[in-house]
């Protein structure tokens, strides 16, 4: 036989109506009675849990998540500086927060791309050109045989220098 534990309590802060509706119902009286919601929660204990196995301190309640919520979870890899538009295109941008850009715009637009990897590569190239070889990137540093290792400004990155 299953055992059911009912916990009932009144939440004085929860109401179904606003305070304006309360005063209208009472004919505009200045005294308002504070109403709350009476809530009842039930916990079902399965008889298969014997009294020997059931330790109150170690009992854990399982939370069941419906499968439909698990399906909507995104499993795609996220890249730094890359986001997806609602219609499926990928965009890359460098954001400068808290004055890190020193007089530059807050957001440096890098473009729109068909895949997340293309957008991440554009971010990496611009980040290395803008910040230098120690810039945070998605794929690590490019090959060492690049002839141009100079750090350039944001306007040159935006023009595609």
UniProtKB/Swiss-Prot annotation:
Protein's GO biological process: ethylene-activated signaling pathway
Stretches the record annotates as Disordered: 1-35
GO molecular function, one term: DNA-binding transcription factor activity
Principal cellular location given in the protein's record: nucleus
UniProt entry tagged with the keyword Nucleus: yes
Residues annotated to bind DNA: 78-140
Localization: Nucleus
SMART domains with a match to the protein in the record: AP2 (SM00380)
Entry's family note: Belongs to the AP2/ERF transcription factor family. ERF subfamily.
Official protein name in the record: Ethylene-responsive transcription factor ERF070
Organism taxonomic ancestry: Eukaryota, Viridiplantae, Streptophyta, Embryophyta, Tracheophyta
Gene: ERF070
